[in-house]
């Protein structure tokens, strides 16, 4: 039985949330990756000896095909006339539909390995991280890859024989978002030319280039870089597409001459992902998931003219004016297509289906190729089935592949019989059906243990909620040192349950951390049930402290309203507008709670109503913002005015020391400096002049000093006043919301801070009106409302300026001012810092609210812990692993954020103590000392 000591509970809570946050990956997203399969060759008679895979990173399908108006020349033109001519006369084309996340690593893995990397792979990152599964490159005789150091190494280092893959890369310093992007692609074309030139004097290289099963991979990052920097409707983005098209035309001519027009070359041009209008990708927006696919050369069909059926064109592609049939594929299908064209084994982990519309071959050849494709998928199912059988006490195989007359062997025999009879089309249909069942069978095996694990996780979360509530009652309500008797039968039941669950995991050969899914539920509920008498006493005390004449009815009503608010917050994760409704209702709170006080303290009440109305507007604004230096500077000016006004006010009110005033003015000047450097950076970047070193260094110095200078206040004695402490904190984070914003985020920061300060004053006035000095520290059921307000404000701190999609589609405009060269981890760290600032502000305000109300330290935080995981449980069941990848990614993000916020509230408690250390409140003098 665990102790419910506050510090121990917090420690256990951290471990529990970290362990159970990972539960969705153990349940919904167990990696489908398996090893040990036999390889199956795509075709014994490959139509091509060599293949060129050209990936225009970040190229949208519409920009590749439609006529656009160039923003510089004003002329309407096709950006890729050579590729367009191929589509019209020599190629099969279509749209390749990608999956989320629409990022470079998963996109290239799908293209080259035919495998949709499981979502848990995001923990791997992509730089220098090898793919641990088979790929087209791995099956080739030799692959020449040229391009970005972010993509090439992962395929080379993940190959069985690394000497099989050449990776020719530029340095990371090439990826400077503030400079021209074309030089990235020029590097690729120039170095490919060098390879062919060297072969004239290098017999070994020449023989290698002329061998069969050779793959050339050109990763062209320029389009993506231009799109991030200047948007996909900019001259830079358009010019980069034109540059690529021109150089592909030159390359095709050079290759044909080198190989003496032997017609043994196949070409595939596509993109790993698209690009949204605001210059980002990552989510499931159609502009991100629709990419061009053009294939031509040996083994590829010629275009089919479009007649009455419009050639499969829809409203999206009709404007491209391409009178040929459009053939869409899933991104993973491209790996199967490439394998067929040069006669490679299908990658053993591929789930792609050979797109026969692209294949120029006899019906028998197609039938055999698609049969081999089905065999490769069936091989995965058989290996997976054997693994699952060995870990189950009772195993039930997948019915469509095990029922009489439908076994895999019987289905394959039927396919072979159809081919032998010359019924090629029927055999293709049968092979495609088998592939479908193999994929759904893999899904069946993946989800075999879902019910058991989800039940354990649910019981665990309810157990944690019960433990948090029990700990709160014992620490702040009962406050009794009276020992309680341990129930030995209950302890025995707990041990037996734990032994059974752990034994089951051992039999299944589950990872060691799975045992935590058994330990936490058993330990939590045993601890709570052992203290059931104390819990009942605590609830009784709270009921007696209730101001309601019918405490039971009031408790039911409060619980109901609390659940409504929590469910509204859940809804707000999908529709931010609900937070505006909540703020609208919050304007009524002072009048409903205590009309007399609301009327008497009308200035504070009016300020509350006004700020609620203003805050409600932020969650109605678009989360995708366009850079506006005017709004950035206006919000900075507002911070400046507030800083000056309150510095003067506090100087008069508190007679601040000269040193304190000097430090405050230094903080104000840092806001001014940040505004200046931000303006200089934006103007230079907008003019395409790159980031001036002076502005970059100045921006970094201003940002870092803004976080360091506040500590100078602790050298004096003035910083103990809570009003001064709030001003110090406000000015400390002000520069962050200047240099790391692109639009109205600075206004949100000011308003968020203001409403928290007003809330502190209003809560204090309400409490002063209903308590005596003797009962001031007593917690009542009504205090749970403050905990809910705190939790609600923590959600506003995040959703006030964005949502999940706005993080995945984070605009790089602001980080360019500090980091112009592509560095995803540093850029991501700056983003996370800006996101966390409102939580730090909330933490400080909550610490001061604790002091002003005179309630025990940590009481409000403890109450928040009792309710926060209700959100987590909601999102646990809202996680999906099928449907659109936008839904899948959103579900994962929501669950992790909800669980992370519960975890983060524990961190905020410590941060609160640090931020308000030494603060004193008058007339009820309390003090928090920094607890190390």
From Swiss-Prot:
E.C. numbers: 2.-.-.-
Cytoplasmic topological domain: 1-8, 478-486, 531-551, 599-603, 649-653, 718-737, 808-828, 881-900
Pathway assignment: Glycolipid biosynthesis; glycosylphosphatidylinositol-anchor biosynthesis
Domain of life: Eukaryota
Transmembrane segments: 9-29, 457-477, 487-507, 510-530, 552-572, 578-598, 604-624, 628-648, 654-674, 697-717, 738-758, 787-807, 829-849, 860-880, 901-921
Keywords, in A-Z order: Cell wall biogenesis/degradation, Endoplasmic reticulum, Glycoprotein, GPI-anchor biosynthesis, Membrane, Transferase, Transmembrane, Transmembrane helix
Stretches of the chain found on the membrane's Lumenal side: 30-456, 508-509, 573-577, 625-627, 675-696, 759-786, 850-859, 922-932
Database matches in SUPFAM superfamilies: Alkaline phosphatase-like
Membrane topology category: Multi-pass membrane protein
Glycosylation sites: 138, 202, 360
Entries under CDD domains matching the protein: GPI_EPT_1
Pfam families given in the database record: Phosphodiest (PF01663), PigN (PF04987)
InterPro entries: Alkaline_phosphatase_core_sf, GPI_EtnP_transferase_1, GPI_EtnP_transferase_1_C, Phosphodiest/P_Trfase, PIGN_N
GO molecular function: mannose-ethanolamine phosphotransferase activity
GO BP terms, alphabetized: cell wall organization; GPI anchor biosynthetic process
Similarity field: Belongs to the PIGG/PIGN/PIGO family. PIGN subfamily.
PANTHER family per record: GPI ETHANOLAMINE PHOSPHATE TRANSFERASE 1 (PTHR12250:SF0), PHOSPHATIDYLINOSITOL GLYCAN, CLASS N (PTHR12250)
UniProt name for this protein: GPI ethanolamine phosphate transferase 1
Organism: Yarrowia lipolytica (strain CLIB 122 / E 150)
């Amino acid at each position: 039985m665990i102790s419910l000591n506050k510090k121990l509970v917090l420690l256990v809570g951290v471990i529990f949330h970290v362990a159970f946050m990972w539960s969705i990956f153990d349940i919904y997203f167990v990696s489908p990756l398996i090893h040990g399969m036999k390889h199956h060759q795509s075709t014994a008679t490959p139509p091509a000896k060599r293949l060129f895979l050209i990936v225009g990173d970040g190229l949208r399908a519409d920009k590749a095909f439609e006529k656009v108006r160039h923003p510089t020349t004003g002329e309407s033109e096709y950006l890729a006339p050579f590729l367009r001519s191929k589509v019209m006369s020599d190629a099969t084309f279509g749209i390749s539909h990608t999956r989320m996340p629409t990022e470079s690593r998963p996109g290239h893995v799908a293209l080259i390995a035919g495998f949709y990397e499981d979502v848990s792979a995001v923990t791997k990152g992509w730089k220098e991280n090898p793919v641990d599964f088979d790929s087209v490159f791995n099956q080739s005789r030799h692959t020449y890859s040229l391009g970005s150091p972010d993509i090439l190494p992962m395929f080379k280092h993940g190959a069985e024989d690394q000497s099989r893959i050449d990776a020719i890369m530029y340095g990371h310093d090439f990826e400077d978002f503030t400079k021209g992007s074309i030089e990235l692609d020029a590097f690729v074309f120039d170095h490919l030319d060098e390879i062919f030139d060297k072969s004239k004097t290098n017999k070994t290289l020449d023989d290698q280039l002329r061998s069969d099963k050779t793959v050339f991979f050109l990763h062209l990052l320029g389009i993506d870089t231009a799109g991030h920097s200047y948007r996909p409707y900019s001259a830079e983005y358009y010019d980069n597409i034109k540059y690529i098209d021109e150089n592909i035309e030159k390359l095709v001519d050079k290759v044909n001459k080198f190989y003496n027009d032997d017609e043994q070359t196949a070409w595939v041009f596509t993109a790993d992902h698209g690009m949204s209008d605001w210059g980002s990708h990552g989510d499931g927006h159609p502009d991100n998931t629709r990419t061009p696919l053009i294939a031509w050369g040996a083994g590829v069909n010629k275009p089919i003219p479009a007649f009455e059926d419009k050639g499969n064109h829809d409203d999206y592609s009709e404007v491209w004016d391409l009178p040929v049939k459009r053939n869409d594929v899933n991104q993973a299908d491209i790996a199967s297509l490439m394998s067929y064209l040069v006669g490679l084994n299908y990658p053993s982990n591929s789930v792609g289906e050979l797109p026969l519309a692209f294949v120029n071959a006899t019906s028998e050849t197609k039938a055999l190729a698609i049969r081999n494709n089905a065999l490769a998928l069936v091989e995965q199912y058989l290996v997976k089935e054997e693994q699952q059988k060995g870990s189950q006490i009772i195993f039930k195989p997948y019915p469509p592949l095990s029922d009489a007359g439908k076994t895999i062997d019987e289905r394959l025999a039927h396919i072979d019989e159809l081919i032998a009879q010359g019924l090629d089309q029927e055999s293709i249909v049968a092979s495609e059906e088998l592939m479908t069942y193999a994929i759904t069978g893999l899904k069946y095996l993946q989800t075999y243990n879902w019910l058991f694990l989800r039940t354990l996780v649910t019981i665990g979360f309810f157990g944690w909620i019960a433990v948090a509530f029990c700990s709160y009652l014992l620490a702040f309500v009962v406050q009794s040192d009276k020992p309680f008797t341990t129930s030995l039968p209950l302890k025995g039941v707990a041990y037996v349950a734990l032994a059974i669950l752990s034994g089951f995991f051992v039999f299944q050969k589950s990872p060691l951390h799975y045992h935590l899914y058994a330990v936490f539920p058993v330990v939590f509920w045993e601890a709570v049930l052992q203290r059931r008498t104390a819990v009942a006493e605590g609830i009784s005390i709270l009921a007696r402290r209730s101001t309601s004449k019918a405490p039971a009815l009031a408790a039911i009503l409060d619980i109901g309203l609390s659940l409504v608010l929590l469910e509204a917050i859940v809804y707000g994760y999908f529709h931010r507008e609900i937070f505006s409704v909540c703020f609208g209702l919050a304007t009524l709170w002072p009048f409903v709670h205590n009309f007399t006080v609301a009327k008497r303290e009308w200035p504070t009440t009016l300020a509350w109503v006004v700020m609620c109305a203003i805050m409600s507007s932020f969650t109605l604004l678009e989360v995708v913002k366009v850079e506006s230096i005017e709004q950035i500077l206006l919000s900075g000016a507002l911070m400046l005015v507030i800083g000056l006004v309150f510095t003067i006010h506090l100087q008069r009110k508190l007679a601040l020391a000269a040193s304190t005033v000097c430090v405050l003015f230094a903080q104000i000047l840092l806001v001014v400096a940040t505004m200046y450097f931000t303006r200089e950076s934006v103007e230079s970047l907008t003019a395409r002049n790159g980031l001036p070193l002076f502005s970059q260094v100045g921006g970094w110095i201003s940002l870092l000093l803004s976080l360091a200078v506040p500590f100078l206040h602790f050298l004096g004695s003035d910083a103990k006043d809570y009003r001064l402490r709030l001003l110090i904190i406000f000015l400390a984070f002000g520069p962050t919301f200047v240099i790391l914003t692109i639009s109205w985020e600075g206004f949100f920061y000011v308003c968020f801070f203001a409403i928290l300060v007003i809330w502190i004053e209003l809560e204090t006035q309400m409490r002063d009106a209903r308590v005596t000095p003797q009962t001031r520290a007593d917690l009542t059921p009504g205090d749970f409302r403050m905990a809910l307000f705190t939790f609600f404000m923590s959600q506003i701190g995040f959703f006030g300026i964005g949502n999940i999609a706005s993080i995945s589609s984070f605009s790089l405009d602001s980080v360019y001012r500090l980091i112009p060269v592509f560095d995803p981890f540093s850029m991501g760290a700056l983003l996370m810092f800006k996101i966390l600032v409102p939580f730090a502000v909330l933490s400080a305000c909550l610490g001061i609210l604790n002091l002003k109300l005179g309630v025990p330290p940590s009481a409000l935080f403890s109450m928040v812990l009792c309710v926060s995981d209700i959100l987590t449980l909601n999102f646990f069941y809202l996680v999906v692993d099928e449907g659109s990848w936008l839904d899948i990614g959103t579900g994962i993000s929501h669950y992790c954020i909800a669980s992370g916020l519960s975890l983060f509230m524990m961190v905020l408690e410590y941060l609160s103590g640090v931020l308000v250390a030494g603060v004193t409140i008058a007339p009820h003098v309390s003090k928090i000392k920094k607890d190390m």
